Amino acid sequence: MQKAEHIQLDFRSAEHLPILKEFELPDDQVQFTAHPKEALNVVEGQHPIVILADGHPVGFFILHVTERVKEYTSNPYAMLLTTLSIDHRQQRKGYARRGMLALSSFIRSQFPTCNEVVLAVNHKNVPAQQLYERVGFQDTGRRRMGPIGEQWVMNITL
C-alpha cells in the first residue's frame, strides 16, 4: 500500500476485524501497547477507534469514558486514550501522527461534551512521547506505575 492521502478516524466495525486481527507489531512495541485482537471484547464506555488510510485500517486505539479515566484526571469531561498501535507494515508513513491530529475534530463531533484527552506513555517509549508532543499533548507532570515501569500522564485540551 502506498502512502495514503486521506486519513480518517471511525468506530471499529465488523468489516475492520479481519485486517485488525492481522496487524503485525514487533516485540519492542508490543511491550508498550496491546494488539488490536486483544481488544475485541470491550465494555460499556470503551470506544474502539480505527485509523483509516484511504478506507483501509492502518491503526487502532481505544477511547474510554469509564471509571478508569479518574486514575488520570479529575476532569469529569475527559476521555482516556489507550492501546494506540499502527500495523508494522504501515509504519513510518505518518499515519499515527495524522490519526492523532484528526483526534480533536473526531471527538468534538462524536463526543461533544469531552474537553480533554489523557493518556499514559511509558517513560522508555520515547517514539510515542515524541509523537504525542508533536500533535499537541503535554506532560502533566503526573506519574504512575504501569505494568513495565513508570508512565508519564499527558493530556490535550480540546
Residue ranges and their predicted role:
Residues 97, 123-141:
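Conserved active-site alpha-helix within GNAT-family acetyltransferase domains
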Residues 87-89, 93, 123-124:
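Active-site acidic-Proline motif in GNAT/NAT acetyltransferases
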Residues 64, 118-120, 140:
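Solvent-exposed beta-strand sheet faces enriched in polar/charged residues
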Residues 94, 111-112, 136:
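Short glycine-rich hinge loops at helix-strand junctions in the catalytic core
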Residues 92-100:
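Glycine-rich acyl-CoA binding loop
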Residues 113-129, 145-150, 155-158:
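Conserved beta-strand-loop-alpha-helix junction that forms the acyl-donor binding cleft
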Residues 2-7, 11-83, 87-89, 101, ...:
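Acetyl-CoA-dependent GNAT
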